[in-house]
């Protein structure tokens, strides 16, 4: 059982009902596993993704049989720069791919041009540069920007059968089948309204299906025998006789059953029972008469041949009539007909033959061919490539290449598996092209479906949709790049002259095509996205996202309701809650918490196996297809002590349907109740009490919570907080266990011991980094020197983390009550105390950059010498013209000074005079400095300067280089010291464990032969003395010691090489885009306190805007004098139906009150107070169901217990997993322990008057988040600014410095008030009256009255549009009209 009182590095009381059998799988394993397999980083025995791509393209043959280009092997280099260096320098974190290519030059026969031998073999290594490499964070750094490749949820390759309503005929269903490959032509089979079966290739014109079969080489007679049961009719006494088969008479009999003599054995219209049929067979009935009226209009299955001449009288598929039948009776003994009346078949194939007859007849005349198979191939060629001339050989090759050529067509292993499963085939899985059998079986199954014997597929079933993760997506892109390269190589082959002996592989292969294709995917692909780094949760969920969009996926404008809807197969696989609001709803989803993706890309869900009503501990992961037919009980099913289901009848699921079943019939049970939801939804406590719409908002808004200055984990959690922190890269986890040796601001060192002896591991923490969303990222240690840590334990928190748990907000004391109308419409009233305490303060880092470029008139210069600037405006710049670190920046201040050369113009005498006085420079340069924007205020925390090779570095660059070098030197020194310490520990451990071979004296202690030296005697001995001591040990120990020395010598050499490589990168000239000579990046940290207008939310979709920040003395207060922190509107609860927030506030209040009781014990510190503390904590923890709290807490030592109790003093932490929340009786017990009234309400007093509130108020503790919709980034004003080019109206939006839209409804408001002058002003001078606004501006600047308005530009736009419709529009003014 994995349920534990521990959560991260703290204790949390867990209320789970069901014992946890397995831990939540690593949340990011899908992407890592997929990419590692692509580059074979997992060293698996199976063929890697990149190898498959190479083998699908190579070898490439010369059409003239002179050359062959083969792939030999590939190798991946190490990345040149670290992740951090790539982000700072704007580079791509990548590796180079080294491909070994072999060129074989063949000897040819001069006459036949056939290969007769090998003339020469040449091998060469070719570099494919910049293959992006996945970082440890499961992201990619592309041009300095961190990106994520989202998993694609797409249609699985294979065969799918559908039915749709006919668009032309009412109440008619059209049946279709599709064979969908991963690469190649799609094949569609479809019935039309007249029940003719057609086929389409790639949505081109349809052709009768028989054309395709003929093109595949089948004769008419073969096709008929494939699709129809053949009925043989013997002719005797001018009658047609057929074998008596009871299966032909299922249902009511259509005609009298007569024996050979004409005796009626069974009348028409009556049902032929099995008993009666058996009786007839017993009585010796073999043949029955086949009536001529049933035979008329039937079709021959084989030709009727004249016995004497051997001529064909009637060909296959001749329609029979009475005259033909009379002739047949006279001349033949028997005939074969296609039995289209048999069960499960219809006349679709016969109708297709009738349709293709005219087509082939016409082609016979135009092409001059008789062979119908060749004509069918030509017909398909003409449909696919209309207008192109064709010969029969080319047509046959074309048809073969469409479906049977591995280079052009690939079903993949998945598609083959789906085909075999659906059609009952046994084709080997390595055959990933179509076979004739595939096509025939698909057509047969479609006919069965049409005739009620097959099953329609559900395209939204997760058995028909699969996940393409990063490895597969990259392999597809790489394949596209190689296909382009393959085409270019083949073109080069054809253009080569006869002299091919001197040719090398590099002359043929152009790797740029591959690099370009891959970089296009990463920079412009729909699935490669700018990573959401607002907080650790947003990052984790972004990497777990499934998108139905992207190349080969759906288009959101055309996606219907069905594909977006929640499907029964999503249960435990795809989260039904977490999806965006808006036009992407249902198209972008998230994996459920416990879901895994198998090697074929299908999502699996975990279940426990049930045998005869007993729940076993065997856990199975099943795909949606494997789950079919299973009877599955929910996790909430009541079990007895022996894990046997208690109830005889229980509610279960089978194939998405809810039904009652006996316990003996149950085959599986859900692993846990929460497995149905995704990570973000699993973080919402009491989710089961929230409306689905609000749960959706809640899970989405948690991803928007900004990291606060001091985040705290929720008092009321769900247990998922520690799981998210465990798998997010932001936290540092110990790779190996041990004791904390040293902790400082930057590093943590862990000393441990394994089978090889002692070791020291170093972990480096990141500080004040900017994320993609401009939030701050810093890591801080949560361990201290001397602490014991286990492998995998979190030793340093990232942003939005506390004690190894996710912490995206603050616990606040809230009251549900109106407060003077300030919390109308979900507005939030906040206490000033929260702002003073920096409770919701966040730090944001902004990056500003400026480039100095090479221009035709000269080079731009970063300088402090800026024309027309006062000295006081430049005081904060250094001598290089760059802002100093630590400067407090205000809007409008210069960050980096830059001057740009003006074009050379002949100076006027005045300018010559100015130049003579003020120097040469001032005249012909212009100020192009980088200024702080209107809303930008903060402190400069870092500056990065990059200079191109060949250009002089400034003093600031040299200083930055020295600082960086000193940091590297210090790091290197620290690591060497730790390596020395590790070496000494290993040596002392070795010497203290083994006996001496001769006598030895250490200080005052003397040791005899066979003694073991005390470790304490060796601790203070230096390295050189140890060398002499080693000689007193056996040869084996001496050899081990020498090996150890050599190992550490090698490690030091590696450290030195690594350090030298870093210094080399530091000293190298920076890589900058062409034309850029210098790049300066300035980083500013801005402190954003909570303000009126900021958006806040709880975890239940209860969002609102801060409307008022009230002095804490005016806020409502409790009887003990404590003021509430936040006042929320009670009307926000009933209509939104998110009752979870009420329950959360109740449990949060319990946590706070119990915390106060623990704090009281700390304050009083009576005798044996630690014992009292332990007893109190045990009493609280005993409320949970599955934990033996007493056993756990009794094992914790006093110091650790005090640490945990201090944490609980600020609020006892609870975990209430989703669907397993705290029950009513447990709430009562907790309320009694916390001494809270049973209604959960309390008396409140008005802070302003001191009077008691009329009603008791629901006061509790709720976890509140500050979202990244900050008012500081939204407030915007404009006086004048840019105008739209066509309409001449002000543009919109803050980014463009736009105006406020005065829309149609606002115009109505002014019309209603009769404010005519204001209205005219709004629609003219303040909008698009170009002359009027210019005149108004002049009048205002001169202090004159504003003149009358003119005609708005919109009027002219309208008249021009009318003119474009060929309408003559003339404008008359009033005076002309009067005349």
From Swiss-Prot:
Gene3D superfamilies: 2.40.50.100, 2.40.50.150, 3.90.1100.10, DNA-directed RNA polymerase, beta subunit, external 1 domain, DNA-directed RNA polymerase, subunit 2, domain 6, RNA polymerase alpha subunit dimerisation domain, RNA polymerase Rpb2, domain 2. The RNAP catalytic core consists of 2 alpha, 1 beta, 1 beta' and 1 omega subunit. When a sigma factor is associated with the core the holoenzyme is formed, which can initiate transcription. InterPro entries: DNA-dir_RNA_pol_bsu_ext_1_sf, DNA-dir_RNA_pol_bsu_external_1, DNA-dir_RNA_pol_su2, DNA-dir_RNAP_su2_dom, DNA-dir_RNAP_su2_hyb_sf, RNA_pol_bsu_bac, RNA_pol_bsu_CS, RNA_pol_bsu_protrusion. Keywords: DNA-directed RNA polymerase, Nucleotidyltransferase, Transcription, Transferase. Belongs to the RNA polymerase beta chain family. Its EC number is 2.7.7.6. The gene is rpoB. GO terms for biological process: DNA-templated transcription. One of its GO terms (cellular component) is DNA-directed RNA polymerase complex. It comes from the Bacteria. GO terms for molecular function: DNA binding; DNA-directed RNA polymerase activity; ribonucleoside binding. SUPFAM superfamilies: beta and beta-prime subunits of DNA dependent RNA-polymerase. Pfam families: RNA_pol_Rpb2_1, RNA_pol_Rpb2_2, RNA_pol_Rpb2_3, RNA_pol_Rpb2_45, RNA_pol_Rpb2_6, RNA_pol_Rpb2_7. DNA-dependent RNA polymerase catalyzes the transcription of DNA into RNA using the four ribonucleoside triphosphates as substrates. NCBIfam families: PRK00405.1, rpoB. It comes from Campylobacter fetus subsp. fetus (strain 82-40). It catalyses: RNA(n) + a ribonucleoside 5'-triphosphate = RNA(n+1) + diphosphate. PANTHER family: DNA-DIRECTED RNA POLYMERASE I SUBUNIT 2. This is DNA-directed RNA polymerase subunit beta. Disulfide bonds: none annotated. It is an enzyme of class 2 (transferase).
């Amino acid at each position: 059982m994995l349920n534990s009182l521990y959560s991260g590095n703290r204790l949390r009381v867990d209320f789970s009902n069901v014992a946890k059998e397995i831990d939540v799988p690593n949340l990011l394993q899908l992407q890592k596993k997929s990419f590692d397999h692509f580059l074979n980083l997992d060293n698996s025995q199976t063929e890697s993704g990149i190898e498959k791509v190479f083998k699908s393209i190579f070898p490439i043959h010369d059409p003239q049989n002179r050359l062959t280009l083969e792939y030999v092997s590939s190798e991946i280099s190490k990345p040149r720069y670290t992740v951090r260096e790539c982000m700072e320098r704007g580079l791509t974190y990548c590796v180079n791919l080294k491909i070994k290519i072999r060129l074989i030059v063949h000897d040819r026969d001069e006459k036949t041009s056939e290969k007769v031998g090998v003339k020469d073999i040449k091998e060469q290594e070719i570099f494919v540069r910049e293959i992006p490499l996945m970082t440890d964070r499961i992201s990619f750094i592309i041009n300095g920007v961190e990106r994520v490749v989202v998993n694609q949820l797409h249609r699985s390759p294979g065969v799918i059968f559908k039915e749709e309503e006919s668009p032309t005929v009412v109440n008619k269903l059209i049946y279709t089948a599709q064979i969908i490959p991963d690469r190649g032509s799609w094949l569609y089979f479809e019935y039309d309204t007249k029940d003719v079966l057609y086929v389409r290739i790639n949505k081109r014109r349809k052709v009768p299906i028989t054309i395709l079969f003929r093109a595949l080489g089948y004769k008419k007679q073969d096709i008929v025998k494939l699709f129809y049961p053949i009925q043989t009719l013997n002719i005797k006494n001018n009658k047609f006789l057929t074998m008596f088969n009871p299966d032909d008479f299922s249902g009511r009999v259509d005609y009298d059953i007569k024996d050979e003599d004409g005796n009626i054995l069974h009348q028409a219209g009556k049902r032929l029972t099995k008993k009666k049929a058996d009786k007839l067979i017993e009585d010796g009935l073999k043949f029955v008469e086949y009536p001529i009226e049933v035979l008329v209009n039937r079709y021959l299955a084989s030709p009727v041949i004249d016995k004497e001449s051997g001529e064909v009288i009637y060909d296959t598929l001749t329609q029979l009539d009475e005259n033909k039948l009379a002739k047949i009776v006279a001349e033949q003994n028997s005939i074969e007909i296609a039995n289209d009346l048999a069960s499960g078949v219809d006349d679709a194939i016969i109708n297709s033959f009738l349709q293709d007859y005219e087509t082939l007849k016409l082609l016979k005349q135009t092409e001059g061919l008789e062979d119908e198979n060749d004509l069918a191939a030509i017909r398909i060629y003409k449909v696919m490539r209309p207008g192109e001339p064709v010969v029969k050989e080319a047509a046959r090759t074309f048809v073969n290449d469409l479906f049977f050529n591995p280079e052009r067509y690939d079903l993949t292993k998945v598609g083959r598996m789906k085909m075999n499963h659906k059609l009952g085939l046994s084709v080997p899985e390595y055959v990933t092209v179509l076979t004739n059998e595939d096509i025939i079986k698909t057509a047969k199954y479609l006919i069965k479906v049409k005739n009620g014997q097959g099953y329609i597929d559900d395209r939204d079933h997760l058995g028909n949709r699969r996940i393409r993760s990063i490895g597969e997506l990259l392999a597809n892109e790489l394949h596209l790049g190689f296909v382009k390269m393959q085409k270019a190589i083949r073109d080069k082959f054809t253009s080569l002259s006869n002299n091919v002996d001197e040719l090398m592989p590099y002359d043929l292969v152009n790797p740029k095509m591959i690099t370009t294709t891959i970089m296009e995917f990463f920079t412009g692909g729909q699935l490669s996205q700018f990573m959401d780094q607002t907080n650790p949760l947003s990052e984790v969920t972004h990497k777990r996202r499934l998108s139905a969009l992207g190349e080969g996926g759906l288009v959101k404008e055309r996606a219907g309701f069905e594909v977006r809807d929640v499907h029964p197969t999503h249960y435990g696989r795809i989260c039904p809650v977490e999806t965006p609001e808006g036009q992407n709803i249902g198209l972008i989803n998230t994996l459920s918490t416990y879901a895994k993706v198998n090697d074929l890309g299908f999502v699996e869900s975990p279940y426990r196996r049930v045998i005869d009503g007993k729940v076993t501990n065997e856990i199975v992961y099943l795909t949606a297809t494997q789950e079919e037919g299973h009877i599955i009980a929910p996790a909430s099913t009541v079990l007895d002590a022996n894990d046997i289901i208690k109830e005889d009848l229980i509610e279960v699921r089978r194939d998405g349907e809810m039904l009652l079943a006996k316990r003996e019939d149950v085959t599986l049970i859900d692993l846990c109740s929460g497995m149905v939801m995704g990570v973000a939804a699993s973080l919402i406590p009491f989710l089961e009490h929230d409306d689905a719409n609000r749960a959706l908002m809640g899970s989405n808004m948690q991803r928007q919570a900004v990291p606060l200055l001091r985040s705290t984990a929720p008092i009321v959690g769900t247990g998922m907080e520690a799981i998210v922190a465990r798998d997010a890269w932001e936290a540092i986890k110990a790779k190996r266990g041990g004791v904390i040796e040293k902790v400082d601001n930057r590093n943590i060192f862990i000393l441990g011991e394994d089978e090889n002896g002692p070791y020291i591991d170093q972990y480096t923490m990141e500080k004040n980094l900017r994320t993609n969303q401009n939030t701050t990222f810093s890591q801080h240690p949560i361990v201290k020197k001397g602490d014991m840590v286990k492998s995998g334990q979190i030793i340093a928190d990232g942003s939005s983390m506390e004690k190894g748990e996710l912490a995206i907000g603050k616990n606040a004391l809230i009251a549900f009550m109106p407060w003077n109308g300030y919390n109308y419409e979900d507005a939030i009233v906040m206490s000033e105390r929260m702002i003073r305490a920096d409770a919701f303060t966040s730090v944001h880092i902004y990056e500003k950059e400026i480039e100095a470029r090479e221009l035709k008139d000269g080079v731009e210069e970063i300088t402090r010498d800026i024309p027309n600037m006062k000295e006081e405006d430049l005081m904060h710049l250094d001598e290089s013209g760059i802002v100093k670190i630590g400067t407090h920046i205000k809007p409008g201040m210069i960050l980096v000074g830059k001057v740009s050369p003006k074009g050379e113009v002949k100076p006027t005498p005045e300018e010559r005079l100015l130049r003579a006085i003020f120097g040469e420079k001032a005249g012909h340069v212009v100020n192009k400095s980088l200024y702080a924007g209107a809303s930008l205020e903060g402190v400069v925390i870092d500056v990065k300067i990059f200079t191109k090779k060949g250009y002089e570095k400034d003093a600031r660059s040299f200083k930055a280089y020295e600082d960086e070098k000193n940091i590297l030197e210090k790091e290197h020194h620290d690591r060497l010291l730790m390596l020395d310490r590790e070496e000494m520990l290993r040596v002392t451990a070795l010497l203290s464990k083994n006996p001496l071979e001769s006598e030895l004296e250490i200080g005052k202690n003397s040791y005899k032969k066979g003694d073991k030296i005390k470790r304490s005697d060796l601790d203070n001995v230096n390295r050189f003395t140890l060398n002499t001591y080693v000689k007193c040990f056996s040869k084996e120990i001496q050899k081990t010691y020498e090996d150890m020395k050599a190992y550490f010598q090698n490690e030091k050499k590696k450290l030195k090489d690594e350090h030298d490589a870093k210094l080399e990168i530091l000293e190298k000239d920076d890589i900058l885009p062409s034309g850029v000579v210098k790049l300066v990046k300035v980083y500013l940290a801005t402190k954003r306190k909570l303000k009126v207008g900021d958006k806040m939310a709880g975890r239940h979709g209860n969002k609102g805007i801060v409307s008022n920040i009230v002095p804490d003395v005016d806020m409502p207060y409790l009887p003990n004098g404590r003021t509430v922190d936040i006042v929320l509107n009670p009307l926000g609860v009933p209509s939104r139906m998110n009752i979870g927030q009420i329950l959360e506030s109740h449990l949060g209040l319990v946590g706070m009150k119990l915390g106060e009781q623990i704090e009281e014990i700390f304050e009083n510190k009576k005798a044996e107070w630690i014992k009292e503390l332990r007893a109190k904590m045990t009493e609280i923890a005993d409320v949970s169901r599955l934990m033996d709290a007493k056993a756990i807490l009794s094992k914790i030592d006093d110091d650790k217990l005090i640490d945990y109790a201090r944490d609980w003093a600020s609020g006892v932490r609870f975990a209430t997993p989703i669907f397993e929340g705290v029950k009513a009786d447990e709430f009562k017990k907790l309320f009694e322990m916390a001494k809270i009234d049973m209604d959960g309400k309390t008396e409140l007093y008005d802070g302003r008057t001191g009077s008691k509130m009329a009603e008791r108020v629901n006061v509790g503790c709720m976890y509140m988040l500050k979202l990244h919709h900050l008012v500081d980034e939204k407030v915007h004003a404009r006086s004048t600014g840019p105008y739209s080019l066509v309409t001449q109206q002000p543009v919109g939006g803050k980014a463009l410095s736009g105006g406020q839209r005065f829309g149609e409804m606002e115009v109505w408001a002014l019309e209603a008030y009769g404010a005519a002058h204001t209205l005219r002003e709004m629609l003219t001078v303040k909008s698009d009256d170009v002359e009027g606004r210019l005149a108004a501006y002049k009048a205002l600047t001169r202090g004159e009255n504003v003149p009358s308005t003119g005609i708005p530009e919109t009027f002219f736009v309208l008249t021009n549009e009318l003119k474009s419709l060929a309408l003559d529009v003339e404008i008359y003014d009033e005076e002309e009209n009067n005349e």
